[in-house]
Amino acid sequence: MFRTSSASAAGSGGSRWRGPVAVAAALLGLVTAVASAQLSGPARSAAPRRTLTVATWNMCGVEQWNCRSTGSPTAKRNALEAMASRSGARVFFLQEVCAGDLDRVRADLGASWHTEFRPYTWRGVTGRTTTVRCAGAGQGAAGVALLSAYRLSAVEPVESRQPAVGLRRGILCATVADQGVRVCTAHLSRPGDDRAHPDWELRDDQLKALAAAVPGRTVYGGDLNTDPPGPRDPDSWIWPAGPYRAQRECDQASASSRSGRPTHVSGHKIDYLFSDLPRLDCSVRGTGASDHYALLLRVRTR
């Protein structure tokens, strides 16, 4: 039985979620204690490998992207490791993660953990593409990643429409071999991200590419940079048919529900986990080390 509390609307409109650093930091401190509460009580016991807990978290690890006041690299790594050791997360979808932090976390968790990484790139007006780097010695490139306690196979990026000029994020998929579950982490563009065509909407094409990339037995999601679809949201048209219908969202209370708890300090829900597998638990966790909360979904795999 899926356990959840009453979901509330996460807000709508065209607000930009990465606001001034001071505002984000203040909100982060105010709401962390509230958001860190689990959605439900202790999970029922289950046979090993019959369930899978997947977490998505935008770590806000790229300091130059208004992230300097959201927590140190050490705090971010500790929060990630705690979700693995205390919350039972076995697959992570990560956004705005630094390659150096990812390598350190994998080493701390042990040799049985596996990672896959796709860097962000910047495409200039001349067409030259460069890799986005994290600030700080040894932090390496910034990007999206999969972190898994199980071996990952059939790893591949998903091609999707990206800005002609500007920041290119992306979608990365793999199969959790021991579970036979296809997983995809995504970080979508924001309106105006294409410097050459600031009025172009890219998220509709990116969402279609993401939804088309997943077969049955899947968990997918990440930072989608949009509110849930709804009558008061002018951007609802960007959502394809699969999400919320063929695959239920972590915090989706019913077939007709399109709301969920906020996953960002601005009060918006912009982080998602969708699955066609039976959902058992959904929780939103304030880590104190990002302007995003972590979203955790436990599904039955057998």
Q: Where is each model-derived feature located?
A:
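Short, flexible/disordered intra-domain loops and linkers
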Residues: 64-72, 126-133, 194-198, 229-237
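Metal-dependent phosphoester/phosphodiester hydrolase catalytic core
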Residues: 170, 174-201
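Alpha-helical scaffold elements lining the catalytic groove of polysaccharide deacetylases
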Residues: 70-74, 198-212
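N-terminal, active-site-proximal structural segment of metallo-dependent hydrolase catalytic domains
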Residues: 2-109, 122-126, 302
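Active-site beta-strand/loop signature of hydrolases that rely on acidic residues for catalysis
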Residues: 53-59, 82-105, 147, 174, ...
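Metal-dependent phosphoester-hydrolase catalytic domains
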Residues: 3-4, 11-14, 38-39, 212-219, ...
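Active-site-proximal beta-strand elements of phosphoester/diester hydrolases
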Residues: 51-66, 156-158, 180-190
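Structured beta-strand-rich core segments of catalytic domains in phosphoester-bond hydrolases
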Residues: 97-180, 285-286
